[in-house]
From Swiss-Prot:
Organism: Bacillus subtilis (strain 168)
Keywords: DNA damage, DNA repair, DNA replication, Hydrolase, Magnesium, Manganese, Metal-binding, Mutator protein
Residues binding Mg(2+): E48, E52
Disulfide-bond pairs as recorded: none
Chain positions of motif Nudix box: 33-54
Designated name of the protein: Putative 8-oxo-dGTP diphosphatase
Length: 149
């Protein structure tokens, strides 16, 4: 079964990217998550930002779709902006929020996010990319899926 995720790059006035610290694994990530049945990737992206950060958001562009055939997974990446709401640093899925310069991303990030952020910085729009996960990353992802996280 193919899974789909939707993630969003949100910039503030200082051109910093909003990151969330995940509770399931101690890594920084873009706001986002799984697309629910009957939901579009765009709807999922907006919903996930609200659930993970407390912010309402609007999407302005699709950066691309990142295919991970080894795991039958595809991730939709969007660019968006905050339209309201209030920061929620500690939620059910999120252990923290922070704004970071695109040139100073944290060391511990979800695999492939830095590449996606670099694609955005380089002007990517509506690209379709096939990602090859390393053996270690593949093993971690497989273990996570089997544990239901």
């Amino acid at each position: 079964m193919y899974t789909q995720g939707a993630f969003v790059i949100v910039l503030n006035e200082s051109q910093q990217i909003l990151l969330v610290k995940r509770k399931d694994v101690p890594l920084w990530d873009l706001p986002g998550g799984r697309v629910d049945p009957g939901e579009s990737a765009e709807e999922a992206a907006v919903r996930e930002i609200l659930e993970e950060t407390g912010y309402n958001a609007a999407l302005s562009a699709k950066i691309g779709v990142y295919q991970r055939p080894k795991f039958q997974d595809e991730q939709h990446l969007f660019f968006g902006s905050i339209t309201g709401g209030q920061a929620m640093a500690d939620g059910t899925e999120t252990a923290g929020l922070k704004w970071v310069s695109p040139g100073r991303l944290p060391l511990f990030m979800v695999p492939n996010r830095k590449r996606q952020i670099n694609d955005f910085k380089n002007g990517a729009q509506d690209v379709n990319v096939t990602v090859k996960d390393s053996g270690l990353l593949a093993a971690i992802d497989l273990l996570k899926r089997r544990l239901g996280k």
